Amino acid sequence: MSLQFLRSEASDGAGETSDASSADFLLDPQTATHLARLTGRPCNRLIYRTALTHRSVLHDHHSEEHKPESNQRLEFLGDAVLDLLISEHLFKQFPGSDEGHLSSNRAKIVNRKSLAAFALELQLGEHLIIGESADKQKIRTSESALADALEALVGAIYLDQGLAGAERFITNHVIAKVDLHKLVEAEYNYKSRLIEYTQSRQLPPPLYTVITEEGAEHEKTFVVEVSCNGQPLGRGTAPRKKDAEQLAAKEAMKRLESGDLGNLNEPSPQNS
């Protein structure tokens, strides 16, 4: 296959940078002070202003010469930097986790709701640059606008301070706010995952049934089966019923994710 989009020479188009010194729009003193506390001393102040510029400014009247740039491009870059650095952190912290668990945990950290919460704590909404005709108060508290601003800020830090600077910011203001152990516990709560799976597919809730209960009171063994829509999904065996249910749900999730089970939307013939 011919990859025609690849450059024939690595130097073509390289080294293009924006000239912050020629910028007509810089940061106001309060925002500059706030960003310095969060990121260290900015070198390219224009790029941080762009990171905080909401797309609503594009609807204002500007001459072509002085037309501002919104934070959407920086948001794209920051999203990739966040994914990379959060992925690396989880990869190192949890050497026993497989790709699926790592991806799931990363998604919990970098989803829009989480990013907006981080941005709110960093008071980014108060420093957003918003179009004159836009609803400023609504945008300053908007989940989407806050998440976009955080991603754009990460992109700006990356361009201004490099990967090391972006990593410092993410470590101090994102990772430090996440209880990774609770995150992993939630990931390994297979009963919760199974409920989420059935709810997302408009299926009946999972049903757990004790198949056998053997042994004396202090040394019992439970065998629990979980089913959905009359179809058995998995079994678990453990000294505690709660643990047996988790193991049954774990087997069910493994089979569901591997496509080992049929269509759960069709009730089992025995229940028809």
Curated annotation (Swiss-Prot):
Active site: D79, E151
Enzyme class, first EC level, given as a word: hydrolase
Key word Transcription regulation present: no
Domain of life: Bacteria
Principal subcellular localization: cytoplasm
InterPro entries attached to this UniProt entry: dsRBD_dom (IPR014720), RNase_III (IPR011907), RNase_III_dom (IPR000999), RNase_III_sf (IPR036389)
UniProt-annotated binding residues for Mg(2+): E75, D148, E151
Entry GO terms, CC: cytoplasm
Alphabetical list of SUPFAM superfamilies matching this protein: dsRNA-binding domain-like, RNase III domain-like
Catalytic activity of the protein: Endonucleolytic cleavage to 5'-phosphomonoester
Species of the source: Chlorobaculum tepidum (strain ATCC 49652 / DSM 12025 / NBRC 103806 / TLS) (Chlorobium tepidum)
Family as reported in the entry's similarity comment: Belongs to the ribonuclease III family.
Name used for this protein in its record: Ribonuclease 3
Lineage of the species this protein comes from: Bacteria, Pseudomonadati, Chlorobiota, Chlorobiia, Chlorobiales
Free-text function comment from the UniProt entry: Digests double-stranded RNA. Involved in the processing of primary rRNA transcript to yield the immediate precursors to the large and small rRNAs (23S and 16S). Processes some mRNAs, and tRNAs when they are encoded in the rRNA operon. Processes pre-crRNA and tracrRNA of type II CRISPR loci if present in the organism.
